[in-house]
């Protein structure tokens, strides 16, 4: 059995390499937008659905018409076609319709690791030299990198590399297929998690873990006002935009660090984690909490928790979103309809008289419900 693991490094390309990376961003953006427009037009006019393989055939003709497309990595252009195809597949599963890519927004491209041969010598197109701290990438050759993983070796087969640019900094994310044997653990501890806005995580142990990341809204608002006053196309506008991007990158990295720290802490202490399935889309429609949801990375946390649990052989159990975790007394199971009101933070059970903290009570109920589901699955 094998699993995929990503390693991200910051890279330091020279002037020529930066030009090639930016040129590849432009070419992949052109291919993506061109085929997105073609798919949209053909479907609207004659209900014809194009596949990725139809577009790959057209890509060859497109490269003949536009010679500059041949200057960049061909694998990156092909991968871009498959990314568009995946975007349409996700759309038919219920996600949003694919959007046209704009210059300067989430710039990245992906290239595959291929086996090449030169003078009877076989070599891979993507290679990492930890000793000299360089990574070899198609069309870029050797690029310097730096990061906390520079002292480690990557075990497994490199499948692809994604080069990205954020706040004028360049990064590479290397996807590796690693051999994996899932650990078999006899669970001895269980925990329930109630996710929220004021307290990010409330555990069934009574612990409240707050969102440690604070967004400097005053500074962000000031920078955005400054950007609005700048003349379009001016150097000052570019500098102001870069300051905003760097602030967002700082916030993103802080949130990522917090998510991994909390996920590791929870999985270190528990073998079974029960968590409520939240309907985040519906929550965004509630005006009073929509703004606060942007500051709480609930979806990212659940994704990290799930994949880390898989790696450690632990279990994450999702509880039905309609389960009344806040309304039921965890002592006598009495259901109090009045607790539906979110302003009720503490309440006394009319049946047994026990005083409840809304979030702690919810996390305890989630834990018990998760334990029931686990026991049923174990019997089956």
Positions of PLM-derived features:
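Nucleic-acid substrate recognition interfaces
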Residues: 1-380
């Amino acid at each position: 059995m094998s699993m995929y693991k990503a390693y991200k490094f910051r890279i330091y390309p020279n002037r020529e390499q930066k030009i090639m990376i930016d040129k590849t961003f432009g070419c992949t953006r052109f291919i993506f937008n061109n085929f997105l427009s073609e798919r949209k037009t053909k479907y609207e006019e004659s209900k014809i659905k194009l596949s990725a393989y139809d577009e790959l055939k057209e890509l060859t003709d497109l490269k003949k018409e536009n010679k500059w497309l041949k200057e960049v990595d061909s694998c990156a252009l092909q991968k871009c076609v498959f990314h568009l195809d995946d975007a349409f597949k996700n759309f038919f599963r219920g996600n949003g319709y694919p959007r046209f890519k704009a210059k300067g927004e989430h710039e990245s491209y992906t290239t595959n690791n291929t086996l090449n041969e030169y003078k009877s010598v076989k070599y891979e197109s993507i290679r990492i030299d930890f000793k000299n701290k360089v990574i070899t990438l198609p069309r870029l050759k050797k690029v310097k990198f730096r990061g906390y993983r520079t002292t480690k070796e990557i075990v497994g087969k490199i499948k692809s590399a994604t080069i990205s640019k954020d706040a004028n900094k360049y990064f590479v994310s290397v996807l590796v297929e690693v051999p994996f044997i899932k650990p078999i653990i006899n669970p001895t501890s269980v925990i329930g998690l109630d996710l929220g806005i004021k307290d990010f995580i409330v555990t069934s142990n009574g612990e409240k873990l707050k969102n440690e990341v604070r967004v400097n809204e005053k500074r962000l608002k000031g920078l955005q006002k400054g950007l609005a006053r700048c003349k379009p196309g001016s150097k000052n506008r570019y500098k102001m935009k870069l300051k905003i991007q760097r602030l967002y990158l700082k916030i993103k990295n802080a949130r990522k660090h917090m998510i991994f720290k909390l996920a590791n802490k929870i999985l270190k202490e528990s073998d079974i984690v029960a968590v409520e399935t939240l309907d985040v889309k519906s929550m965004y429609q509630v005006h009073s909490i929509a703004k606060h949801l942007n500051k709480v990375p609930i979806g990212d946390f659940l994704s990290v928790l799930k994949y880390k649990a898989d790696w450690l052989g632990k279990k994450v159990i999702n509880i039905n979103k309609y389960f009344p975790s806040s309304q039921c007394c965890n002592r006598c199971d009495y259901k109090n309809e009045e607790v539906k009101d979110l302003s009720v933070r503490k309440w006394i059970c009319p049946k047994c008289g026990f005083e409840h903290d809304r979030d702690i009570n919810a996390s305890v109920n989630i834990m018990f419900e998760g334990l029931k589901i686990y026991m049923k699955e174990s019997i089956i």
